[in-house]
């Protein structure tokens, strides 16, 4: 079953709309501007106010999926997309574990920058080490370990009074969310264990935002999914003060539900008598002390409203798209699709419904698959008022004096090209960085049951490759990326190169992408039963042999993805450059 989110662009026919013919040369001028300014396509201008919009998380309980898997997922805009296996280790009693600043960075303007693989940044503190750690996959925001524990992360907004900025030697808080994720993956087997450990770490050592906001995590294991939301407590906090160094709350996702986090906290009312809720002791007290909530008012305490600013359209639109797609009959959703009974509004002027309109989670009307999650992650809001490729600015004169969509039409135009053509910008779900879908299956041994469907760069263009939880290594192509130095031996650079070439003639070139990528990716899915049957047979005789088989297969597949993108790059260069007219 598919929710139809992966239909390729480029089928737009003629449209009877008036247009000034001066737009035609403007398109070519805009394309020239895109070529010059493409490296800055995903970054905001200096001094612009930015709110978190880079991460979309989807979590799904086991009774809502096609085969009983549990899913958590993550699309991320972080530049630290390199993935490598950190093996489990043993330590002496009394050893200390370093706490780092600099695991993540966000492009050229971030002074944290790219570090050598395995260097996790400046050590700003220590916590007690455990005697044995588990193997996990390390990325900017590490996401999965050998025991099928997986975490999706989404930075959220918080009220400015809660903000904490890192100043070496001054800031007392030391625990970033990405560091807490690493500790959880190294030390925990279940979602509940991870939730409680992360909550304890941010309370004890102080939550230090690395992206300037609060954080939401979708933590999953083969049995259940939890959402954990964390706010900082401002720069005045002191360790040892007896006050928690963070404000946090958590809610369990019903087993037959799907939850979305779109850079905005999702929990509203908290009922600590219900075992599906957990929270810090100060979850309400901080709001009372700061004058943000009056217990005598008679109004219920709403977590979301107490600590977060008003939700923005870029957050709402993702909630709307996914919830209205998987649960269309749940309620009267805003009409924002361009087909059927479309809305009289456009993204230039419409009523926004507010965060309270959306439930914490929804029960999908059809069972969800890995491919469905991938489809949402690749979404550019096709067929909706947010579809930037549907903007009339792309229309050019065609045969018989009819207006047709320019071959340059793309949902991923650079900021300069959008300014030139006066295209209203909107945040797509697909965004540059890296991401994953974690598929967790309790009926299989951990090394086989957990699959880390991983991509780099833009998921709309990239290929998802399955990495099994028990593998001992990954392809060197996926361990290599430096934004300041191009490399043929970097998966991220190869995908990015292809994406830039697609813009030479997007409407035609994207068909070449599908022709090259889709059969390879589909092969990963169709061969899954055979691969896992063989791995399970090996595991029953010798678990080490199963791990070796899956490691070799995973590395080979990751290499095949890079080879495919190299070949596609060569095709696009020869087909859409040179002597074309």
Regions found by a protein language model. Give the residues of each.
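Bacterial N-terminal signal peptides that target proteins for export
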Residues: 16-29
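Histidine-centered catalytic/metal-binding microenvironments
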Residues: 517-581
């Amino acid at each position: 079953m598919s929710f139809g989110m992966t239909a390729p662009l480029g089928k737009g026919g003629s449209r009877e709309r008036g247009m000034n013919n001066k737009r035609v040369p403007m398109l070519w001028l805009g394309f020239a501007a895109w070529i010059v300014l493409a490296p800055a396509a995903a970054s905001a201008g200096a001094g612009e106010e930015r709110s978190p919009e880079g991460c979309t998380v989807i979590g799904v309980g086991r009774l809502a999926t096609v085969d009983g898997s549990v899913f958590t997922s993550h699309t991320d805009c972080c530049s630290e997309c390199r993935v490598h296996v950190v093996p489990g280790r043993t330590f002496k009693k009394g050893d200390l574990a370093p706490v780092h600043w600099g695991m993540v960075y966000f492009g050229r303007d971030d002074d944290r920058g790219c570090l050598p693989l395995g260097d996790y940044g400046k050590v700003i503190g220590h916590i007690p080490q455990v005697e044995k750690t588990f193997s996990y996959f390390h990325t900017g925001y590490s996401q999965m370990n050998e025991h099928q524990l997986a975490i999706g992360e989404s930075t959220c907004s918080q009220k400015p009074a809660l903000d904490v900025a890192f100043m070496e030697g001054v800031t007392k808080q030391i625990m970033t969310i990405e560091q807490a994720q690493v500790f959880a993956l190294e030390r925990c087997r279940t979602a509940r264990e991870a939730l409680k450990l992360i909550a304890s770490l941010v309370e004890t050592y102080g939550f230090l935002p690395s992206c300037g906001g609060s954080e939401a995590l979708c933590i999953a294991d083969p049995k259940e999914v939890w959402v954990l939301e964390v706010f900082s407590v401002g720069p005045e906090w002191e360790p040892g003060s007896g006050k928690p160094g963070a404000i946090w709350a958590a809610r369990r996702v019903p087993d037959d539900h799907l939850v979305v986090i779109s850079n905005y906290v999702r929990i509203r009312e908290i009922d600590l008598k219900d075992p599906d809720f957990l929270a810090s002791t100060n979850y309400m007290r901080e709001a009372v002390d700061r004058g943000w909530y009056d217990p005598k008012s008679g109004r219920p305490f709403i977590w979301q409203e107490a600590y977060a600013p008003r939700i923005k359209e870029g957050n709402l639109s993702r909630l709307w798209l996914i919830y209205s797609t998987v649960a269309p009959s749940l309620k009267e959703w805003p009409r924002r699709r361009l087909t059927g009974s479309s809305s009289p509004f456009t993204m230039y002027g419409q009523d926004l419904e507010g965060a309270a309109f959306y439930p914490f989670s929804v029960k999908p009307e059809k069972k969800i698959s890995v491919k469905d999650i991938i489809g949402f992650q690749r979404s550019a809001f096709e067929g909706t008022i947010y579809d930037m490729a549907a903007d009339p600015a792309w229309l050019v004169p065609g045969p018989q004096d009819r207006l047709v969509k320019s071959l340059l039409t793309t949902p991923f135009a650079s900021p300069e090209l959008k300014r030139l053509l006066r295209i209203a910008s909107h945040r797509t779900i697909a965004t540059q960085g890296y991401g994953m879908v974690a598929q967790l299956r309790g009926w299989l041994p951990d090394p086989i049951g957990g699959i880390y469907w991983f991509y780099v760069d833009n998921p709309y263009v990239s290929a998802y490759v399955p990495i099994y939880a028990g593998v001992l290594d990954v392809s060197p192509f996926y361990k290599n990326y430096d934004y300041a130095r191009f490399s043929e031996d970097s998966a991220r650079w190869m995908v990015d190169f292809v994406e830039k070439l697609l813009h030479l003639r997007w409407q035609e070139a994207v068909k070449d992408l599908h022709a090259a990528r889709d059969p390879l990716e589909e092969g990963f899915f169709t061969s899954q039963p055979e691969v896992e049957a063989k791995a399970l047979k090996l595991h029953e005789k010798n678990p080490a042999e199963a791990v070796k088989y899956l490691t070799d297969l995973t590395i080979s597949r990751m290499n095949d993805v890079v080879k495919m993108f190299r070949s596609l790059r060569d095709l696009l260069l020869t087909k859409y450059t040179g002597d074309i007219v």
